[in-house]
């Protein structure tokens, strides 16, 4: 996971929100460890001043998947970078396409958050 440039590791939800809100760009995104579910990650996306959080996890067979909007077919990927590439396209079951990566090395000093909305959808490995 450390090879994924948007992976920020064990940062808090609040810190992730600050990093995204500091960009001010809809479609900004990052990946962080889930604070509530061990072994699960959160794909956090900025859209219209709110942060949407989608849970990402790895199955026992090594495939990666993200829980998306109800009714959207669940897709599995060999690598996290493939999952991210798929969600850069429109109509993939998340609020907006992933457009602006917030890389760990380029994280700036964040501003205070103005709002938050968690989809907080959880996907656990079977």
Curated annotation (Swiss-Prot):
Compositional bias per record (Basic and acidic residues), positions renumbered to this chain: 115-126
InterPro entries the UniProt entry points to: SH2 (IPR000980), SH2_dom_sf (IPR036860), SH2_prot_1A (IPR017289), SH2D1A_SH2 (IPR035876)
Note down the stretches annotated as region Disordered. Answer: 100-126
Q: Which PANTHER family would you find in this protein's record?
A: INOSITOL POLYPHOSPHATE-RELATED PHOSPHATASE DOMAIN-CONTAINING PROTEIN, SH2 DOMAIN-CONTAINING PROTEIN
Q: Which residues form the SH2 domain?
A: 6-102
Sites of Phosphoserine modification = 119
Q: Where does the record place it?
A: Cytoplasm
- What's this protein's function? Cytoplasmic adapter regulating receptors of the signaling lymphocytic activation molecule (SLAM) family such as SLAMF1, CD244, LY9, CD84, SLAMF6 and SLAMF7. In SLAM signaling seems to cooperate with SH2D1B/EAT-2. Initially it has been proposed that association with SLAMF1 prevents SLAMF1 binding to inhibitory effectors including INPP5D/SHIP1 and PTPN11/SHP-2. However, by simultaneous interactions, recruits FYN which subsequently phosphorylates and activates SLAMF1. Positively regulates CD244/2B4- and CD84-mediated natural killer (NK) cell functions.
N6-acetyllysine modification sites are: 89
The record, for CDD domains, names: SH2_SAP1a
Which cellular components does GO assign to this protein? cytoplasm
Acetylation as a keyword of this entry, yes or no, is yes
- In Gene Ontology terms, what is a biological process of this protein? natural killer cell mediated cytotoxicity
Task: Tell me which Pfam families the record gives.
Answer: SH2 (PF00017)
Subunit composition and interactions: Interacts with CD84, CD244, LY9, SLAMF1 and FYN. Interacts with NTRK1, NTRK2 and NTRK3.
Q: Where is this region: Interaction with FYN SH3 domain?
A: 67-92
Q: Which PROSITE patterns match?
A: SH2
Q: Name one GO molecular function term.
A: protein-macromolecule adaptor activity
Location, primary (coarse class) = cytoplasm
**Keywords for this protein:** Acetylation, Adaptive immunity, Cytoplasm, Immunity, Innate immunity, Phosphoprotein, SH2 domain
- UniProt protein name: SH2 domain-containing protein 1A
